[in-house]
């Protein structure tokens, strides 16, 4: 009887010892699950914070580059008239499509933006240039186009070239020439003859002008004597008689005036 009681007591003790061991293992498992869950949460929080900090740094870099590009655009020489140095037309810039980057929509990873030198991340907005196909951030390329109108990488023009309009041929209009009347022809011929005879007469003999009568009497010039210097007389003494008559005619004209 005593042996039976001892055996039952031993069995009951073993069962209590096993249940306490199971409870201890359950507590350890629960604690480990809680610790693992907290660790995962901490890792996710740290990853989110690091990603936010990295994107914030990229935004600062973009703003700094944008401010630098604005200063370059403000300090640019206004006398430069090259097409690549002129700012892009806002209407052309609005026609360039904008996309939102996502890993699901873009199977192959995009290249980094050449303006800010940072890679595209989730939900980043970008533009694809139509001619060369290069991809840039919206903020970066919009700031670039405020002072340039070409691609930052290949310098391909973004703005379409304006068609050259050829000037229309202008018909030449000649004024109609009216026939010259006989009187004009006669007067022109007489004037030509007089002009042709003038140099010949001047070269051969002095020109004689006809005496012109003055109707007014020379009242104010009465008693005026014109004296000719002796040197002038000596120098003109060797001239022919025609020159003397011309001199007398000129003196008479002065006297009449």
UniProtKB/Swiss-Prot annotation:
One of its GO terms (biological process) is protein-containing complex assembly. InterPro entries: ATL1/ATL16-like, Znf_RING, Znf_RING/FYVE/PHD. GO terms for molecular function: transferase activity; zinc ion binding. Gene3D superfamilies: Zinc/RING finger domain, C3HC4 (zinc finger). Its EC number is 2.3.2.27. It catalyses: S-ubiquitinyl-[E2 ubiquitin-conjugating enzyme]-L-cysteine + [acceptor protein]-L-lysine = [E2 ubiquitin-conjugating enzyme]-L-cysteine + N(6)-ubiquitinyl-[acceptor protein]-L-lysine. The chain crosses the membrane at residues 28-48. It comes from the Eukaryota. It is found in: Membrane. Its main location: membrane. Pathway: Protein modification; protein ubiquitination. It is a single-pass membrane protein. PROSITE patterns: ZF_RING_2. GO terms for cellular component: membrane. A zinc finger (RING-type) spans 113-155. Keywords: Membrane, Metal-binding, Transferase, Transmembrane, Transmembrane helix, Ubl conjugation pathway, Zinc, Zinc-finger. Residues 181-209 are annotated as: Disordered. SMART domains: RING (SM00184). Residues 185-206 have a biased composition (Low complexity). Belongs to the RING-type zinc finger family. ATL subfamily. The RING-type zinc finger domain mediates binding to an E2 ubiquitin-conjugating enzyme. This is RING-H2 finger protein ATL5. It comes from Arabidopsis thaliana.
């Amino acid at each position: 009887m005593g042996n039976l009681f001892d055996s039952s007591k031993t069995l009951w003790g073993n069962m209590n010892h096993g249940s306490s061991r199971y409870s201890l293992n359950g507590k350890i498992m629960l604690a480990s699950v809680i610790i693992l869950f907290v660790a995962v949460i901490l890792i996710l929080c740290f990853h989110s914070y690091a990603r936010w900090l990295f994107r914030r740094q990229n935004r600062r870099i973009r703003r700094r580059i944008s401010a630098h590009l604005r200063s370059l655009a403000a300090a640019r020489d206004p006398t430069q008239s090259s097409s690549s140095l002129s700012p892009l037309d806002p209407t052309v810039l609005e026609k360039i499509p904008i996309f939102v980057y996502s890993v699901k929509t873009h199977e192959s990873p995009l290249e980094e933006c050449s303006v800010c030198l940072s890679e595209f991340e989730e939900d980043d907005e970008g533009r694809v240039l139509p001619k060369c196909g290069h991809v840039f951030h919206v903020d970066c390329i919009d700031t670039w186009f405020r002072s340039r109108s070409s691609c930052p990488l290949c310098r391909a023009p973004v703005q379409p070239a304006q068609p050259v309009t050829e000037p229309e041929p202008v018909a030449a209009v000649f004024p109609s020439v009216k026939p010259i009347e006989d009187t004009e022809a006669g007067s022109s011929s007489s004037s030509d003859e007089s002009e042709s005879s003038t140099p010949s007469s001047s070269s051969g003999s002095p020109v004689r002008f006809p005496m012109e009568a003055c109707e007014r009497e020379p009242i104010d010039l009465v008693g005026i004597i014109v004296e000719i210097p002796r040197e002038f007389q000596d120098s003109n003494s060797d001239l022919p008689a025609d020159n003397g008559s011309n001199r007398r005619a000129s003196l008479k004209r002065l006297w009449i005036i």
